[in-house]
Amino acid sequence: MKEQREFDLVVLGSGGAGCSAALAGTALGLSTCLIEKALLLGGGTADSLGTIWIPNNRLAKEAGLADDHDTALRYARFVAGGQEVPENLEAYVREAPRVLDALLALGVKLRLALGLPDYFAPAGPGSCADGRRMVEPELIAR
């Protein structure tokens, strides 16, 4: 018989969201298991140069880059092309900056990925030339 184990939290996928969920669970004292089907970690985040899209964030503001909730939401709606669930998109744009702050507080060394504009900049409504993409340099270096 195969070994059986129990966990408080099981996370499927090791992209930015999965790793963030596993880190948060561990920080809360939960026994956590992160499962990835691929040979390497990173999921969809690895496909986007290891970046996470976090609009209207404090690191960009500290760097003097302008952004706001409504502009970011306009761009997110453009990218979704009418396929979004409006409440989910609104929640992402509203909560992503808070998630960034929580990850930074846990010691994740996310930095602005300067020089990487939104995918549809400058033509996309609400797009930003800089400041919305985060990267964890130590993970990329490995």
Regions found by a protein language model. Give the residues of each.
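Conserved redox-cofactor binding core of oxidoreductases
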Residues: V93-R142
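Glycine-rich active-site loop/strand segments that organize a redox cofactor
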Residues: I54-A91
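N-terminal Rossmann-like FAD-binding beta1-loop-alpha1 element of flavoenzymes
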Residues: L9-L34
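Glycine-rich FAD pyrophosphate-binding loop
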Residues: T26-S48
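Core beta-strand elements of the Rossmann-like FAD/NAD(P) dinucleotide-binding domain
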Residues: E3-F7
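Switch/coupling segment of Walker-type NTPase motor domains
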Residues: G50, L65, L103
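Short, hinge-like loop/turn segments at secondary-structure boundaries
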Residues: L49-I54, A129-D130
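Active-site-proximal beta-strand/loop segments in catalytic clefts of secreted hydrolases
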Residues: S14, K37, N56-N57
